[in-house]
Amino acid sequence: MADAARAARLADRIKVIVAQALERRVKDPRLGFVTVTDARVTNDLQHATLYYTVYGDEEQRADTARALESAKGVLRAEVGKNITARLTPTLTFVADEIPADAARLEELLRTAREKDAQVAEQAQGAQYAAGEDAYRTPSDEDDAEGPESAPRV
């Protein structure tokens, strides 16, 4: 088994090789505007998982997934030529969900900003229920304590 650092270096190298091969060698018309976002290699260097995003709608994403699946052999051969590992890892392509997650997070942040604005609007004319400083301070407690609460010796 290889160490994790070697697997990480190999994953970075595979990511670059596949991205360049998609740009230069694969001429499939189904292939949309693809960005390889991440690559991970198992510690035994046998399997590589490549994460990608596609700019476009669901149909373009599905077409790109089919194009990547059909070009897997060419891409694996290209990876095999350009790495120094004894065996060429198998390639698995996974659509990256980062754009969808980012849109969902953006929606949550927008909702939080709207609620903050509502709270600020409600607080505009509000008054304190127990005065501005509703908390006891140590000086207030000293004044409230009488001789009966003095420590016994």
Curated annotation (Swiss-Prot):
Keywords: Cytoplasm, Ribosome biogenesis. SUPFAM superfamilies: Ribosome-binding factor A, RbfA. It comes from the Bacteria. Residues 116-153 are annotated as: Disordered. It is found in: Cytoplasm. Its main location: cytoplasm. One of its GO terms (cellular component) is cytosol. One of its GO terms (biological process) is maturation of SSU-rRNA. Gene3D superfamilies: 3.30.300.20. GO terms for molecular function: ribosomal small subunit binding. Residues 119-132 have a biased composition (Low complexity). Monomer. Binds 30S ribosomal subunits, but not 50S ribosomal subunits or 70S ribosomes. One of several proteins that assist in the late maturation steps of the functional core of the 30S ribosomal subunit. Associates with free 30S ribosomal subunits (but not with 30S subunits that are part of 70S ribosomes or polysomes). Required for efficient processing of 16S rRNA. May interact with the 5'-terminal helix region of 16S rRNA. Belongs to the RbfA family. PANTHER family: RIBOSOME-BINDING FACTOR A, CHLOROPLASTIC-RELATED. This is Ribosome-binding factor A. It comes from Kocuria rhizophila (strain ATCC 9341 / DSM 348 / NBRC 103217 / DC2201).
